[in-house]
């Protein structure tokens, strides 16, 4: 008998002001396995990393992501950096990083191996390059269109 276990892919991100670039990223990640789980960054993590709170709270971002057909489950991350405990609980076979995430694949792999997590870590390329697929550019267009 073959192994019928599903291949679990995990991605993480802020996903604030969901846009077409996010959807393309999630579709590409889903194609790496059978099950896609998204870790949505905690509001405190966003505030610390970006210097501002997210536009939408984590609960709303999670609910929006759950409505995307490529996504099988969504969890809200813990405050702080990548939670090894959360990754252990999710048991990923693959961790897919976005093209703009500032984590080193090799450093993350080393950290995971040290904790006994043997997930493959890969960085997905930009599939959809456009100002319409960058949250900061969308915010800038909103300000220029409605506030000036």
Swiss-Prot record:
Cofactor: a divalent metal cation
Catalytic reaction equation(s): FMN + ATP + H(+) = FAD + diphosphate
InterPro entries in UniProt: Archaeal_FAD_synthase (IPR050385), Cyt_trans-like (IPR004821), FAD_synth_RibL (IPR024902), Rossmann-like_a/b/a_fold (IPR014729)
Enzyme class: transferase
Keywords: ATP-binding, FAD, Flavoprotein, FMN, Nucleotide-binding, Nucleotidyltransferase, Transferase
Single annotated GO MF: ATP binding
Coiled coil (residue ranges): none
Binding site for ATP: 14-15, 19-22, 100
Swiss-Prot/TrEMBL GO biological process terms: FAD biosynthetic process; FMN metabolic process
Entry EC no(s): 2.7.7.2
This protein's pathway: Cofactor biosynthesis; FAD biosynthesis; FAD from FMN: step 1/1
Pfam families from the UniProt entry: CTP_transf_like (PF01467)
Quaternary assembly: Homodimer.
Family note: Belongs to the archaeal FAD synthase family.
Biological role: Catalyzes the transfer of the AMP portion of ATP to flavin mononucleotide (FMN) to produce flavin adenine dinucleotide (FAD) coenzyme.
The protein's name in its UniProt record: FAD synthase
Organism (species): Pyrococcus furiosus (strain ATCC 43587 / DSM 3638 / JCM 8422 / Vc1)
């Amino acid at each position: 008998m073959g192994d019928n276990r599903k291949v679990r892919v995990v991605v993480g991100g802020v996903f604030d002001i969901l846009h077409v670039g996010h959807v393309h990223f999630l579709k590409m990640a889903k194609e790496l396995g059978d099950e896609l789980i998204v870790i949505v960054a905690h509001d405190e993590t966003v505030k610390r990393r970006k210097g501002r709170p997210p536009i939408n709270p984590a609960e709303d971002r999670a609910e929006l992501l759950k409505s995307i057909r490529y996504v099988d489950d969504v969890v809200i991350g813990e405050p702080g950096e990548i939670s090894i405990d959360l990754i252990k609980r999710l048991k990923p076979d693959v961790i897919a990083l976005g093209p703009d995430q500032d984590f080193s694949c090799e450093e993350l792999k080393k950290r995971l191996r040290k904790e006994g997590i043997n997930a493959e870590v890969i960085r997905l390329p930009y599939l959809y390059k456009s100002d319409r697929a960058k949250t900061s550019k969308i915010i800038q267009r909103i300000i220029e269109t409605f506030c000036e």
